[in-house]
Amino acid sequence: MFSSGWVSGLVRGRVSVAATALTAMTMALVLPAAWAAEPLPAPEGPVILLVSGNIAVINTDEGAAFDREMLQALGLTEIETSTPWTDGVPAFSGVLARTVLERVGAEGSTVMASALNDYTVEVPMEDFQNFDVLLATTMDGEEMKVSDKGPIWIVYPRDQHPELQDRRLHDRWVWQLKALRVQ
């Protein structure tokens, strides 16, 4: 019916696909851990974010301090989403919150997000894992200043996920963000 060469090639092909998938899954698990093991350089510019608490990588006595360039070096993401506080559908750019937390080796179930005015709210770690929550530093191409909810604003992709339009989640949209404490 079938030649043994054909069956043997099919088995090798399936093994090859399985090995490739296993390698990709292993890299997805290992790379964030390896990245978190790398030392974090000291900020050269003004610190705009301090991550502290249950983290593995620090660069100050207080935790992991980031200037704007350090955050941008982690990779920028852009999302367009409406907010209850802006007109239209602004385009926000910044680093994903989960990327920052992975970089510092964060372990925990909640993150306390604090603003410059000391407003603090507890954010479930699941938010950062399940959604592309942005630590936005620009809105519509303009660097956000303190007077415009900057230098960092926690932005949820609410237009892409209707469940994020719940008014009870509005407290988590911390603007003028200064610190994240992992618990």
What are these regions (language model features)?
Residues A19-P32:
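Bacterial N-terminal signal peptides
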Residues F2, W35-Q183:
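N-terminal intrinsically disordered, low-complexity segments enriched in P/E/S/T
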Residues M1-R14:
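N-terminal secretory signal peptides that target proteins for export/translocation
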